[in-house]
Amino acid sequence: MIDYIIIGIIAFSILVSLLRGFVREVLSLGSWIVAFIVASQFYPYLAAYLTQIESMYIRNGTAIAILFVLTLIVGAIVNYVISQLVDKTGLSGTDRVLGAAFGLVRGALIVAALLFFMDTFTNFEQTDWWKESQLIPHFGFIIEWFFQQLQASSSFLTPTLNQ
């Protein structure tokens, strides 16, 4: 049962990315990352102009929301323009195939994250359908690799993470 859900999540991600194309997917992801950075770094500057809001928390939250949404809108416009250029150059077939590959990787990462949280915060790993899954062990490898990379590159994680 869980294997069908895993396949469904990955297939859906592939289909969405196939339809949207690699350029749109990457620019969309980049827009979200940039929006997060812009909102988290520049909200104090906008909050200083929102003096009509008395609560500092609401003022800061409003500034964050405004910056985040505006950055996403600018990202969507840039995404649209660049996507139109890709379509005009005749690279849409290649763009869609690369998009499907992007969707496969994204789907696998989404499934790995879901399985990690289910394993860590629930008792699903003790159920029969979890134990009988043919696919879950493969995602265990991805999760382990991810935490090894984090451990190797982060000063916050000590080498005793896996011990």
From Swiss-Prot:
Keywords: Cell membrane, Membrane, Transmembrane, Transmembrane helix
A GO cellular-component term linked to this record: plasma membrane
One Pfam family matching this protein: Colicin_V
Coarse class of the protein's main subcellular location: membrane
One GO BP: toxin biosynthetic process
Keyword check for Membrane: yes
Localisation per UniProt entry: Cell membrane
Tagged with keyword Zinc: no
Membrane spanning stretches: 2-22, 26-46, 62-82, 97-117
Assigned protein family: To E.coli CvpA.
Name of protein: Colicin V production protein homolog
